[in-house]
Amino acid sequence: MPETPSTPKTTYTVIFDANGGNGTIASISVEEGSEFTLPENTFTKTGYSFAGWATYADGNVSYSDKAKITVTGNTTLYAKWTAITYTITYEPNGGTNADGNPAGYTSGTETITLLAPSRQYFDFGGWYTDSEFSDSSKKNEITKGSTGNIMLYAKWTVAAENAVNAINSLPTGEHKIAVTGQMTKEKLNGVIAAIKGNSNGAKVYLDLGGTAIDFYDWQRCKFADCENLIGIVIPAIESPDKNNPIILIPDLMFEGCKNLKTVIILNSSGEYKIITFKDCTSLEYVEIPTSIVCIHGDAFDGCTALETITYKGTVEKWKQVKTDFKDSKYKLMSLNVQCENGTASGFDLIKE
């Protein structure tokens, strides 16, 4: 008898749909009744994790990734997605966070407007994703469609008239205090006294860059022996003499500030001299503007931690700065100088 021809097996096509995701997965052909393993998912969707496969776009998950299945007809499998919950971490920097600020979000969350924290005596300056508060990192809201865990830092300023109370309230630790507004001799000396006398021994980086102060009021302030001062930004101060360099940092102004690590001098109108930061043994970073045209030879004697100063001008401009003593025994002469277009040294200064 002739052999009965075998009946060919029916094959079905399985199609994979990203269901709002991105990428492609090739369709496959399978024989009716045969078990096969689903290919590994390679679809992606920003802000979502892959949850498995469904047989309807809005259906529940029927199969996990790489599951073994059989089909009874042509089939489309739809990727199912679970929104990732991202964390929002707040560093209020001494303040108290607002109750309404959420701890997390998903990419589908409606835009979140961040609420201001509170802090007695201080003014809130915004939330930032950078602890150094670069302008580009300021964040007022988290827009819908955002992804990723977020760390937010509160920036604070304090008005000059509130600075003493603000400093008195500081707990143990290191604190950067950015003061704004009109500063007077009386206010600044009060600030210095508060730093010296903080009952918790708080260490203060005093940023006066946002203040305005009269030159003579500035010169009548003494930071000497302020052991709790760890940094200072000296504001732009208008010179009362446009024709001659005058002294910006007089003798003894910072004497005994043995924990002072950072000094940044902002550029001012007019020309200035620096007399001394002698014996500031912890001083590590000094930033000098082009308005400084003369530095005393012994200005940094005893600053044993200082190796390099930063000059906010060119090498050529630095070499026009004058000094009264040019001798290798002075610390200034041995310092490296980082300029905008290269490096120089203290010994490049012109002897007056």
Where are the regions a protein language model picked out?
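N-terminal segments that cap or nucleate solenoid repeat domains
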Residues: 159-195, 351-352
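Secondary-structure capping and domain/repeat boundary segments
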Residues: 1-158, 351
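Structural signature of tandem-repeat unit edges
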Residues: 104-106, 177-183, 201-215, 227-248, ...
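Core hydrophobic positions of leucine-rich repeats
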Residues: 39-45, 53, 81, 115-119, ...
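Beta-strand repeat architectures
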Residues: 169-172, 197-199, 301-304
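Beta-solenoid repeat scaffold
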Residues: 148, 190-206
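Extracellular/surface-exposed low-complexity segments
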Residues: 126-128, 156-158, 318, 322-352
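Surface-exposed or flexible loop/turn and strand-edge residues in extracellular/cell-surface modules
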Residues: 11, 25, 40, 66, ...
